[in-house]
Amino acid sequence: MSNGTIVQCIGAVVDIQFPRDSMPKVYDALKLEDAADSFAEAGLTFEVQQQLGDGVVRTIALGSSDGLRRGMKVSNTGKPISVPVGHGTLGRIMDVLGRPIDEAGPVETDELRAIHQKAPKFDELSPSVELLETGIKVIDLICPFAKGGKVGLFGGAGVGKTVNMMELINNIAKQHSGLSVFAGVGERTREGNDFYHEMKDSNVLDKVAMVFGQMNEPPGNRLRVALTGLTMAERFRDEGRDILFFVDNIYRYTLAGTEVSALLGRMPSAVGYQPTLAEEMGRLQERITSTKVGSITSIQAVYVPADDLTDPSPATTFLHLDSTVVLSRDIAALGIYPAVDPLDSTSRQLDPLVVGEEHYSVARAVQQTLQKYKELRDIIAILGMDELSPDDKLAVARARKIQRFLSQPFHVAEVFTGSPGKYVSLKDTIAGFKAIVNGEYDHLPEQAFYMVGGIEEVLEKAKKLQ
């Protein structure tokens, strides 16, 4: 293939000149030829983003651009970035280019696939109405997940997105006999390390492929690592499997796009985001889908800047999801974990035709009780509980019990809390909340409902408290 030379470097964006008759195509991967006389990364990969004309292409460096200088030779591979896919990737940790970073030798697979693929056609898609039980009460009741659906965990800094994601991985990936792909996009290296050991200790490492592009990596890596993970998941789906695809964190994918967009010379849009925000998000999300051959169930953590759900990045993500789990700082401040907001979280599956009449009516009754408590809170703050009518007092007492019963000890937090994690089946969850709403446990103290599993544990705890 043709060779070119570097003519300009601005951070992660590098301009490279090729002969006019052999310009690389957009998304072609280019490789740095010889970096022996400098401390630049040997074999550094660039991805073409724009053709500027006159043989010059503007590229993103997928690695550190330290040590690059004008005049260095670059070769065109003639094809997009391709990564190893298939069963050889299971149990391995890879970077954005599919290179192993777990010091366990090369990835044993001959099959490579380009990270830029078209989304499945409309007639290939397969909608699903089968529910996926998570064992987390608040999620199963208020915002149930669909098998083959897309789920977003929305929350600001420090309200528990990653802990919730780890618990979902613990409950679903371990119960689920299929394969999982985990894409760590711009998150902490420590979390990736914890995830690896969590999987190893529970003996499911041989069913998980891991791709990491962490916070300390250049924006090119963080921008493409989600596509690398997705390409591996698509390959398993296309052989007829049901795949779990975890992404932590979608916001960092957007942020990397913002960093790159400014360097590429594009005019910023609202709040400084890239003008192509919706298109970039759509290109990723439209590929995360289930076909008639196999399914991808994806669970994505979404950081919410300054707790503002109307920020363009989380607002653009909302459009693509089947279930949204919103984590609230106010609920976390009450010490209720998982800090899921039952009034803000939604699911397309919460429909009597999908979940059944009983589940639907219990979930709505729980939400109505909590909504009433929310409305009465201002009156209580000003006038106190004594000024409420007997009916309102009863509604508040039940709402406080429901609020506490929505908390649950997690398996992944055992080491911090000292209390063993609980998995609660959907049947037990519905029965428990139905009994509280119907007033069967009005005589029990509200402390008995805090941080327990099923309703039987509430009765045991109440006996101890008395």
Curated annotation (Swiss-Prot):
ATP binds at residues 155-162. GO terms for cellular component: plasma membrane; proton-transporting ATP synthase complex. Keywords: ATP synthesis, ATP-binding, Cell inner membrane, Cell membrane, CF(1), Hydrogen ion transport, Ion transport, Membrane, Nucleotide-binding, Translocase, Transport. The keyword Protease does not apply. SMART domains: AAA. Produces ATP from ADP in the presence of a proton gradient across the membrane. The catalytic sites are hosted primarily by the beta subunits. PANTHER family: ATP SYNTHASE, ATP SYNTHASE SUBUNIT BETA, MITOCHONDRIAL. This is ATP synthase subunit beta.
